[in-house]
Amino acid sequence: MLGLVVLATLALAVNGVYQVLQKPTELFFPVSGGLNKIPEETWSRYAPIFKKHATEVTTAPFLAALAQVEASGNPIARTYWRWSWRPHFFELYRPASSAVGMYQITDGTFAQARQLCIHDHHVVREGPWNDWHACWMNDLYSRVIPSHAVELVSAYLTANTDELLARYHRNNVSLQQRQQLATVIHLCGAGAGAAYVRQGLHAVPGQHCGDQDVAVYLGRVQAMTRLFNRLQAQDSAS
């Protein structure tokens, strides 16, 4: 019996080391929970960053809302771990996804977003090293640095939202509709975003992306955006 306990403990330790090597941000878990914030704290702490990287689609309140809904404004938020009965040993118990940071950016999204940046509230693409109008030093970006995460998400969502609306010739779309499309892209990916546009900018009842009900998620982000709009208005009035 003791031998089985030792073997199980060793297996968990080996798996833990492997998962940390694959996703080093798991090392933040002892302190991660202490960085959660209420909306007012998120706005107070990061409003200058949200405003700096805002675009016509991803306004500062919208960027704040996504950060609050995804991770309570926690810059090093991590996903939960789960069991999965797969034949590969290191697949048995592992983080639920590669997502990390206040926007829970996955590896795939991170790879695409790093080709973009925000200059003067507009999306700019990666270019030659000597092109001062292009993005530069993007390879040094990190999902757990708030200013990097905000810029990456703002650029990625704005670029994909504008591209999809242009592709399907959707004109006269309101800001709320554009932000809802950006929310779907953030939650489900650009492919689901394209389907959302084809469906008339409406979510299919019961549609899920991962563990999230799309319609419920859209409602949460929209409500949180309204809250951050009020906080921004209070700043302007003071």
Region locations from a protein language model:
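Hydrophobic membrane-insertion alpha-helices, especially the h-region
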Residues: M1-V17
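Catalytic glycan-binding domains that act on GlcNAc-containing polysaccharides
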Residues: G16-Q232
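Extracytoplasmic/luminal low-complexity segments enriched in Pro/Gly and acidic/polar residues
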Residues: A233-S238
